[in-house]
């Protein structure tokens, strides 16, 4: 089951966000949170907040276990 979270109107360029997003694609949630917490890029806190939102959606709306979740697909668009 796919769980979705969307962030819009973020004050960082898509190119900079893409560098951070590429680090966590395919990772388990705990590993992705650790990577984002230790990352010094300006987009890391924004992506971490979005990741936590997606996890909260999965746990609260679909009763999924946080330990079983991973980042299957994450992407950045210019808009």
UniProtKB/Swiss-Prot annotation:
It comes from the Bacteria. One of its GO terms (molecular function) is structural constituent of ribosome. InterPro entries: Ribosomal_uL22, Ribosomal_uL22_bac/org-type, Ribosomal_uL22_sf. GO terms for biological process: translation. One of its GO terms (cellular component) is cytosolic large ribosomal subunit. Keywords: Ribonucleoprotein, Ribosomal protein, RNA-binding, rRNA-binding. Part of the 50S ribosomal subunit. PANTHER family: CHLOROPLAST 50S RIBOSOMAL PROTEIN L22-RELATED, LARGE RIBOSOMAL SUBUNIT PROTEIN UL22M. Belongs to the universal ribosomal protein uL22 family. This protein binds specifically to 23S rRNA; its binding is stimulated by other ribosomal proteins, e.g. L4, L17, and L20. It is important during the early stages of 50S assembly. It makes multiple contacts with different domains of the 23S rRNA in the assembled 50S subunit and ribosome. This is Large ribosomal subunit protein uL22. It comes from Clover proliferation phytoplasma.
């Amino acid at each position: 089951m796919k769980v979705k979270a969307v962030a819009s109107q973020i004050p960082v360029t898509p190119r900079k966000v893409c560098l951070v997003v590429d680090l966590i694609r395919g990772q388990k949630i705990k590993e992705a949170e650790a990577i984002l917490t230790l990352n010094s890029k300006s987009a890391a806190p924004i992506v971490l907040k979005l990741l936590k939102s997606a996890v909260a959606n999965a746990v609260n709306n679909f009763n999924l276990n946080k330990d079983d979740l991973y980042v299957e697909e994450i992407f950045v668009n210019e808009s």
